Amino acid sequence: MRRKAGVRKRETAMGDLTRVFIHGLDSSSRGTKGSFFRERYPEMLMNDYFGTLEERMIQLEAFLAGRKDLILIGSSFGGLMAALFACRHEPLVRRLILLAPALGLVDLGEYYSKPLFLPVTLYHGINDVVVPPEPARRVAARIFANLDCRFVEDDHDLHRVFPTLDWDGLLETGKSGHS
């Protein structure tokens, strides 16, 4: 198998944490981000989700049943799913990494009663016309007490910024992961 320049496989185990990538609405685990993670972090869990938000959440709940110490990476609609899962199961989640999350699509108020304190890193392109960054930031700031929000020079797909992030750092707990 040929690797793209600059992409290397992570050779060492990353502890007992369970890393999960959740794709967006019109994507799959075989999209650009899923392929990146599959190549570099073969132990990362991925699944394909279909249907409405609630149908997808049922699929995600089943996929993650019995797992703990989760680091959830959610892209767009997958970011919304990751946030909802964390609201419902905060003790199981160690960290969230949200990529242009579609947080404004539903009223998250019914899913949480108090702010969540797990570390959350949010990247959002300032040129995103699919999911405007400022409303997503406002929702995230209400839900997550430990939020590191990064607006970046990119669009919704984050194709320029995504591969340059310090994923080794982001996927370890307690590290910011910013280059």
Question: Where are the predicted features?
Answer:
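Active-site catalytic motif of lipid deacylating hydrolases and related acyltransferases
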Residues: 15-68
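Short glycine-rich catalytic loops that host catalytic nucleophiles or stabilize transition states
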Residues: 48, 149-155
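Gly/Ala-rich beta-loop-alpha elbow adjacent to hydrolase catalytic centers
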Residues: 74-82
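A conserved short beta-strand
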Residues: 92-103
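Short beta-strand/loop motif that positions the catalytic acidic residue
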Residues: 122-124, 128
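Conserved alpha/beta-hydrolase "acid-adjacent" motif
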Residues: 129-135
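Catalytic histidine-centered segment of alpha/beta-hydrolase-like enzymes
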Residues: 154-163
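Catalytic active-site module of serine/aspartate enzymes centered on a nucleophile-bearing elbow/loop
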Residues: 162-179
